[in-house]
Design a protein with these regions (language model features):
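Conserved redox-cofactor binding core of oxidoreductases
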Residues: 1-94, 100, 163-187
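Mid-to-C-terminal "cap/lid" subdomains and adjacent gly/pro-rich loops that border
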Residues: 10, 134-195
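General beta-strand structural signal in soluble alpha/beta enzymes
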Residues: 37, 79-80, 116-117, 145-148
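Secondary-structure transition/capping motifs at alpha-helix termini
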Residues: 72-75, 91, 103-105, 132-148
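Core beta-strand elements of the Rossmann-like FAD/NAD(P) dinucleotide-binding domain
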Residues: 103-113, 117
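Flavin (primarily FAD) binding-site architecture
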Residues: 116-141
């Protein structure tokens, strides 16, 4: 999927890509694989150099983009080390949730909306455990269906990354650049040249 506008503002291409990375892209292109200059546009097919999330010469995360700007809002509260125990419905509308913090349970009423961000595995698990999902599968598990949404828990795809380790002659690599005097050069480049 395409990156959001907030996130896209900080996406940048590498300023000094490694010569072997460029060669890899050219080689892939020479055997028919298309070059992809912006895999954050929604099209992830092809060979590409990694894009980075950098703001003011520092790594910029999803937390920096979305979470930190709203931490001080009155209608937002971040709970850490908290487990969502149960979602309570009133006529298919979420009324409240029961959370667990340590050994304590607490009921929180929902005014407008609940945003569930528990990851690729836990989000559908929480929904299904609370009756949101494929009605037939929920019935098999003895879970009362509150909302029949067959897509919940479906279409999870892994993104495989294969690391290739090779020795090179007459070409420095990230491994050789992270040792000895080369490491000092890289530290200098980072702190003073912002590379």
């Amino acid at each position: 999927s395409a990156a959001s506008d907030v996130y896209k503002r900080q996406i940048s291409n590498l300023t000094t890509p490694h010569p072997l990375a460029k060669l890899f892209i050219e080689t892939a292109h020479s055997i028919g694989m298309k070059k992809n200059t912006d895999y954050n546009s929604g099209d992830q097919e092809g060979s590409f150099l990694y894009q980075t999330m950098i703001k003011n010469s520092m790594r910029w995360s999803a937390s920096d983009a979305y979470l930190k700007p709203i931490l001080s809002k009155k209608n937002f509260k971040l709970l850490i080390k908290t487990y969502l125990h149960k979602i309570i419905f009133n006529n298919k509308k979420i009324e409240s949730v029961i959370i667990k913090q340590g050994l304590n349970f607490k009921k929180i009423f929902i005014n407008k909306e609940l945003i569930l961000c528990a990851g690729a595995i836990n989000s559908p698990q929480i929904l299904q455990n609370n009756g949101i999902g494929n009605q037939l599968k929920l019935k098999e598990l003895g879970i009362e269906c509150v909302q029949n949404i067959p897509e919940v828990g479906q279409n999870l795809k892994d993104h495989y990354a294969i690391r290739i380790a090779m020795r090179t002659k007459n070409v420095s690599t990230f491994n050789t650049e992270s040792r000895g005097l080369s490491l000092l050069k890289e530290i200098f480049n980072y702190y003073f040249l912002k590379k």
